[in-house]
Amino acid sequence: MMRNKSTESTQLPNCSNSEELRIEFDSNLRRWFSRNIGVWRSRRQYFFEEEDVLNLEMFIKIEELNKNNTNGIKYQFTWWTETETDFFIKKPNYKKEGVIEASLFGHQLQKSSGYLNNSMCISNIRQVDEHELIFESSYDDWYVLEHTRLIDQDKFRSRNIYSWFKNKLKIVENQLLIWN
Protein backbone atom coordinates (compact mmCIF):
# COMPACT_ATOMS: atom_id res chain seq x y z
CA MET A 1 0.00 0.00 0.00
CA MET A 2 1.45 3.37 -1.00
CA ARG A 3 1.46 5.97 1.73
CA ASN A 4 1.38 9.71 1.46
CA LYS A 5 4.84 10.72 2.72
CA SER A 6 3.48 13.99 4.10
CA THR A 7 1.53 12.06 6.75
CA GLU A 8 4.70 10.36 7.95
CA SER A 9 6.86 13.44 8.24
CA THR A 10 7.53 15.11 11.55
CA GLN A 11 7.23 18.45 9.72
CA LEU A 12 3.73 19.18 8.51
CA PRO A 13 3.27 21.06 5.26
CA ASN A 14 2.03 24.63 5.50
CA CYS A 15 -1.43 24.03 4.12
CA SER A 16 -5.01 24.28 5.31
CA ASN A 17 -5.37 20.54 6.00
CA SER A 18 -2.15 20.12 8.03
CA GLU A 19 -4.16 19.38 11.20
CA GLU A 20 -5.97 16.57 9.35
CA LEU A 21 -2.60 15.13 8.31
CA ARG A 22 -1.39 15.26 11.92
CA ILE A 23 -4.52 13.46 13.12
CA GLU A 24 -4.05 10.75 10.47
CA PHE A 25 -0.41 10.29 11.53
CA ASP A 26 -1.34 10.07 15.22
CA SER A 27 -4.20 7.64 14.59
CA ASN A 28 -1.92 5.43 12.47
CA LEU A 29 0.58 5.21 15.34
CA ARG A 30 -2.16 4.55 17.89
CA ARG A 31 -3.57 1.81 15.68
CA TRP A 32 -0.09 0.25 15.28
CA PHE A 33 0.47 0.27 19.07
CA SER A 34 -2.97 -1.23 19.74
CA ARG A 35 -2.01 -4.17 17.50
CA ASN A 36 0.83 -4.95 19.96
CA ILE A 37 -1.35 -5.30 23.08
CA GLY A 38 -1.01 -8.70 24.76
CA VAL A 39 1.62 -11.20 25.89
CA TRP A 40 4.49 -12.09 23.57
CA ARG A 41 7.18 -14.76 23.82
CA SER A 42 10.44 -13.12 22.79
CA ARG A 43 13.33 -15.11 21.34
CA ARG A 44 16.38 -12.87 21.38
CA GLN A 45 19.84 -13.07 19.93
CA TYR A 46 22.49 -10.61 21.15
CA PHE A 47 25.72 -9.80 19.35
CA PHE A 48 28.04 -7.94 21.70
CA GLU A 49 31.27 -6.38 20.55
CA GLU A 50 34.00 -9.06 20.33
CA GLU A 51 32.02 -11.67 22.27
CA ASP A 52 30.12 -14.84 21.54
CA VAL A 53 26.49 -14.58 20.51
CA LEU A 54 24.09 -14.89 23.44
CA ASN A 55 20.54 -16.22 23.15
CA LEU A 56 17.71 -15.50 25.54
CA GLU A 57 14.01 -16.25 25.75
CA MET A 58 11.76 -13.85 27.63
CA PHE A 59 8.14 -12.79 27.81
CA ILE A 60 6.79 -9.29 27.37
CA LYS A 61 3.31 -8.05 28.20
CA ILE A 62 2.10 -4.82 26.60
CA GLU A 63 -0.90 -3.09 28.17
CA GLU A 64 -2.73 0.12 27.37
CA LEU A 65 -3.26 1.99 30.64
CA ASN A 66 -5.46 4.98 29.83
CA LYS A 67 -7.29 4.73 26.56
CA ASN A 68 -9.41 7.86 27.00
CA ASN A 69 -6.64 10.32 27.89
CA THR A 70 -6.62 13.21 25.41
CA ASN A 71 -3.01 14.13 26.30
CA GLY A 72 -1.61 10.90 24.90
CA ILE A 73 -1.93 7.18 25.42
CA LYS A 74 0.01 5.45 28.18
CA TYR A 75 1.36 1.90 27.84
CA GLN A 76 3.03 -0.46 30.26
CA PHE A 77 5.71 -2.92 29.13
CA THR A 78 6.37 -5.74 31.60
CA TRP A 79 9.07 -8.33 30.89
CA TRP A 80 10.30 -11.49 32.61
CA THR A 81 12.03 -14.77 31.99
CA GLU A 82 10.78 -18.16 33.10
CA THR A 83 14.01 -20.09 32.63
CA GLU A 84 17.28 -19.82 34.52
CA THR A 85 20.14 -18.72 32.32
CA ASP A 86 23.67 -17.42 32.77
CA PHE A 87 22.84 -14.47 30.50
CA PHE A 88 22.19 -12.22 33.50
CA ILE A 89 25.43 -13.31 35.17
CA LYS A 90 27.39 -12.50 32.00
CA LYS A 91 25.46 -9.25 31.46
CA PRO A 92 24.54 -7.89 34.92
CA ASN A 93 23.32 -4.56 33.46
CA TYR A 94 20.35 -6.42 31.99
CA LYS A 95 17.34 -7.14 34.19
CA LYS A 96 15.55 -10.48 34.11
CA GLU A 97 12.28 -8.71 34.91
CA GLY A 98 11.00 -5.17 34.95
CA VAL A 99 8.40 -2.60 33.99
CA ILE A 100 8.60 0.46 31.78
CA GLU A 101 5.74 2.92 31.37
CA ALA A 102 5.56 4.83 28.12
CA SER A 103 3.35 7.61 26.79
CA LEU A 104 2.67 8.20 23.11
CA PHE A 105 2.62 11.90 22.22
CA GLY A 106 2.31 12.43 18.48
CA HIS A 107 5.46 11.03 16.89
CA GLN A 108 7.33 10.50 20.20
CA LEU A 109 7.29 7.77 22.82
CA GLN A 110 8.33 9.01 26.27
CA LYS A 111 9.57 6.09 28.42
CA SER A 112 10.08 6.02 32.18
CA SER A 113 13.47 4.38 31.57
CA GLY A 114 15.58 2.93 28.80
CA TYR A 115 16.43 -0.73 28.45
CA LEU A 116 20.14 -0.01 28.97
CA ASN A 117 19.75 2.32 31.97
CA ASN A 118 17.24 3.78 34.40
CA SER A 119 17.05 7.24 32.83
CA MET A 120 13.86 8.57 31.32
CA CYS A 121 14.15 8.70 27.54
CA ILE A 122 12.24 9.85 24.49
CA SER A 123 12.13 7.89 21.26
CA ASN A 124 11.32 9.62 17.99
CA ILE A 125 9.12 7.46 15.80
CA ARG A 126 9.08 7.11 12.02
CA GLN A 127 6.41 5.01 10.36
CA VAL A 128 7.71 2.98 7.41
CA ASP A 129 4.31 1.54 6.50
CA GLU A 130 1.25 0.22 8.34
CA HIS A 131 3.30 -2.69 9.74
CA GLU A 132 6.68 -1.17 10.68
CA LEU A 133 7.94 1.60 12.92
CA ILE A 134 11.48 2.87 13.50
CA PHE A 135 12.35 4.17 16.97
CA GLU A 136 15.34 6.45 17.47
CA SER A 137 16.57 7.20 21.01
CA SER A 138 19.54 8.94 22.61
CA TYR A 139 20.36 8.84 26.33
CA ASP A 140 23.46 8.65 28.56
CA ASP A 141 25.91 8.43 25.61
CA TRP A 142 23.79 5.70 23.97
CA TYR A 143 22.21 6.04 20.54
CA VAL A 144 19.66 3.29 19.83
CA LEU A 145 17.98 2.55 16.49
CA GLU A 146 15.16 -0.01 16.56
CA HIS A 147 13.12 -1.41 13.67
CA THR A 148 9.94 -3.22 14.75
CA ARG A 149 7.71 -4.93 12.21
CA LEU A 150 4.42 -6.79 12.68
CA ILE A 151 4.25 -9.89 10.48
CA ASP A 152 1.65 -12.46 9.36
CA GLN A 153 -1.48 -10.66 10.54
CA ASP A 154 0.21 -9.60 13.80
CA LYS A 155 1.06 -13.12 15.00
CA PHE A 156 4.76 -12.22 14.96
CA ARG A 157 6.93 -9.17 15.65
CA SER A 158 10.44 -8.81 14.33
CA ARG A 159 12.76 -6.39 16.12
CA ASN A 160 16.24 -5.39 15.04
CA ILE A 161 18.01 -3.10 17.49
CA TYR A 162 21.38 -1.40 17.00
CA SER A 163 22.99 0.30 20.00
CA TRP A 164 26.00 2.63 19.84
CA PHE A 165 27.84 3.82 22.93
CA LYS A 166 29.90 6.98 22.40
CA ASN A 167 29.55 6.54 18.62
CA LYS A 168 30.81 2.95 18.61
CA LEU A 169 28.47 0.06 17.77
CA LYS A 170 28.33 -2.12 20.89
CA ILE A 171 25.20 -4.28 20.61
CA VAL A 172 23.16 -5.74 17.78
CA GLU A 173 20.00 -7.49 18.90
CA ASN A 174 17.58 -9.57 16.83
CA GLN A 175 14.25 -10.64 18.25
CA LEU A 176 11.36 -12.72 17.04
CA LEU A 177 8.27 -12.29 19.17
CA ILE A 178 5.39 -14.73 18.99
CA TRP A 179 1.96 -13.69 20.19
CA ASN A 180 0.69 -15.95 23.00
Predicted regions and their residues:
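Calycin-type beta-barrel ligand-binding domains and close structural analogs
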Residues: 3-21, 83-180
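Amphipathic/hydrophobic helical signal segments and adjacent flexible N-terminal regions
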Residues: 1-97, 171, 180
